[in-house]
Amino acid sequence: MSCCGGKCGCGAGCKCGSGCNGCGNYADITEQSSASETLVMGVVGTQKLNYGQAEAGVATEGSCSGCKCVYCTCDPCTCK
């Protein structure tokens, strides 16, 4: 479940804030887009993490209660 129904607020330093009036993390039903996205996947690095370390990293890196704001700009606010 995402925070605030899929809305993250941009906080200090363009990190995910705790407000419910931020950008939509997921596309709204009424939102339409004609642009396409390209997802590039690959293997990066050789550092090994155990399960506990990986979960801790996910919880602290630009997230608020399940919303990830990896690509976030504050003006205008774009949490993706």
Curated annotation (Swiss-Prot):
A GO MF label: metal ion binding
UniProt xrefs under InterPro entries: Metalthion_15p
Tagged with keyword ATP-binding: no
Name of this protein: Metallothionein-like protein type 2 MET1
Alphabetized UniProt keyword annotations: Metal-binding, Metal-thiolate cluster
Keyword Secreted: no
Species of the source: Fragaria ananassa (Strawberry)
Function: Metallothioneins have a high content of cysteine residues that bind various heavy metals.
